[in-house]
């Protein structure tokens, strides 16, 4: 059984394992560089470690593959009978990360 971990990043918790691809909130790291996630909540595999709140000494290392923007979300607001309307779009930036190792 391969090692996996649950990490906290960008206000979310994600289950990751070696070789998995995750999309996280935009990180200030250039594409091609490595990023280390220190906020590890849980490590599983042959033995499990549960953090209270974090697992001591556990890290997850990944490589930034690219940065991008998600599909556009369009919001439309209007007030009936008042000839008032507003249309607004938003594209959330993200970072694509490939997990290289889970270190417990």
From Swiss-Prot:
GO terms for molecular function: rRNA binding; structural constituent of ribosome. GO terms for biological process: translation. It comes from the Bacteria. The keyword Cell cycle does not apply. It holds the Pfam family Ribosomal_L21p. One of its GO terms (cellular component) is cytoplasm. Keywords: Ribonucleoprotein, Ribosomal protein, RNA-binding, rRNA-binding. Part of the 50S ribosomal subunit. Contacts protein L20. PANTHER family: 50S RIBOSOMAL PROTEIN L21, LARGE RIBOSOMAL SUBUNIT PROTEIN BL21M. This protein binds to 23S rRNA in the presence of protein L20. Belongs to the bacterial ribosomal protein bL21 family. This is Large ribosomal subunit protein bL21.
């Amino acid at each position: 059984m391969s090692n996996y971990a649950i990490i906290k990043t960008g206000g979310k918790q994600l289950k990751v394992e070696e070789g998995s691809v995750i999309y996280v909130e935009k990180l200030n790291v250039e594409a091609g560089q490595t990023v280390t996630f220190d906020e590890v909540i849980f490590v599983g595999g042959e033995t499990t470690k549960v953090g209270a709140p974090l697992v001591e000494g556990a890290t997850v290392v990944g490589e930034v593959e690219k940065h991008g923007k998600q599909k556009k979300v369009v919001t439309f607001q209007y007030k009936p009978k008042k000839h008032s309307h507003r249309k607004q779009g938003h594209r959330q930036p993200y970072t694509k990360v490939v997990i290289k190792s889970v270190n417990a």
